[in-house]
Amino acid sequence: MALSLTTSIALATILFFVYKFATRSKSTKNSLPEPWRLPIIGHMHHLIGTIPHRGVMDLARKYGSLMHLQLGEVSTIVVSSPKWAKEILTTYDITFANRPETLTGEIVAYHNTDIVLAPYGEYWRQLRKLCTLELLSVKKVKSFQSLREEECWNLVQEIKASGSGRPVNLSENIFKLIATILSRAAFGKGIKDQKEFTEIVKEILRQTGGFDVADIFPSKKFLHHLSGKRARLTSIHQKLDNLINNLVAEHTVKTSSKTNETLLDVLLRLKDSAEFPLTADNVKAIILDMFGAGTDTSSATIEWAISELIKCPRAMEKVQVELRKALNGKERIHEEDIQELSYLNLVIKETLRLHPPLPLVMPRECRQPVNLAGYDIPNKTKLIVNVFAINRDPEYWKDAETFIPERFENSSTTVMGAEYEYLPFGAGRRMCPGAALGLANVQLPLANILYHFNWKLPNGASYDQIDMTESFGATVQRKTELLLVPSF
């Protein structure tokens, strides 16, 4: 029987893919260890049905902490140990300093002109300098202290108004709190359409999580349309662009001292100067970073900290005793009151170890061919550092899966990427530039929630019944919302 035209075309397409796959596979002489692969999709079948960071961690434990994965068209190195993280993020840091191009970056992030996705080069270096000296400096983060304190107090009042003994949706409340803090830091006021804005940010994060068909087959443009990804991202971008345009149009640049500048003030000042000229799209891309990278990560960290404390009553009691003893009945908490509270900081460190905000960090890309430990790595190979696996490596951490804040007592370990067994914000040139802001947005809200209220699970459930299931996405979120009952 003669083959139909459709079948012939489909068969020819499959044979073409198989040929390309076979010829590409033979081109690399010294290949890294890898699982068995299939034509066309490569190793994707090993990750189907898994949470990506856990699926990759399980493969690394079988095939090695430096392994290769073929994700569709994309050749990928996966690093899952402190040893290889240190080697690559120091010796080969500049070699892997680029970002892979993605459909999300192209459409949503204004052609990859934000801080996170910008390709390595002069523009990115200027952005990094802008973050270090202006947007995310310690001084600038400190300047937002009063608004953090005010919004945290508003949250406390809102929870009290809901009544003692009634369940509170902490997931919703915490996300709203962080979004409000960041919107005031960026624009000097809350966003009128904040609910719509935060929903758009959440949808962007959902679209960037995992391994999307558009990203594993970047050259197959028809798949971007067939999967509906391009249409979804275009729709998201149009809504987002309209919202940000309105916010910028409503904003009046202050003529006061730099210490009172909002983040948008800084960007508009630089946009109109020769110091570091920015386009309107550049400004919007950077503003998006402040929310996309800041809201979800900080709120998730607070949620996980509270979840772990509910699950571990001993640690919950210890941190609350420390807070209440230090504050001694004080009504409002100021940041100076909690800077030296050691156990609170241990709780945050341990939460970031078990639940790093970006478990696979942001992928990097090789800028040139390189020989790594005897293995030939082609140009444009993607690099994934599995921080989730590194932070739980049993060779470096005793009882690695257990929440034990005391493990950091008398330890010089910091969150800033100096110790490669603990990388909550990554390391090297492309390390998260917003670590200081993120920590400030975690510490004070967490202290307020723990100081003012005692918490328990609804319906008389015991502490060990809390659902700790993770969701699928760019950040490690709880799968279910955190509903707890306050008493005060």
Curated annotation (Swiss-Prot):
Cellular component annotations (GO), alphabetically ordered: endoplasmic reticulum membrane
Tissue/organ expression: Expressed in floral glandular trichomes.
A biological-process GO annotation: sesquiterpene biosynthetic process
Transmembrane segments: 7-23
Keyword Amino-acid biosynthesis part of the UniProt annotation: no
Species this protein is from: Tanacetum parthenium
Protein name stated in the entry: Germacrene A hydroxylase
Binding site for heme: 432
Annotated keywords: Endoplasmic reticulum, Glycoprotein, Heme, Iron, Membrane, Metal-binding, Monooxygenase, Oxidoreductase, Signal-anchor, Transmembrane, Transmembrane helix
Subcellular location: Endoplasmic reticulum membrane
Pathway: Secondary metabolite biosynthesis; terpenoid biosynthesis
Topology versus the membrane: Single-pass type II membrane protein
Entry annotated with the keyword Oxidoreductase: yes
Carbohydrate attachment residues: 169, 260, 379, 410
Source taxonomy: Eukaryota, Viridiplantae, Streptophyta, Embryophyta, Tracheophyta
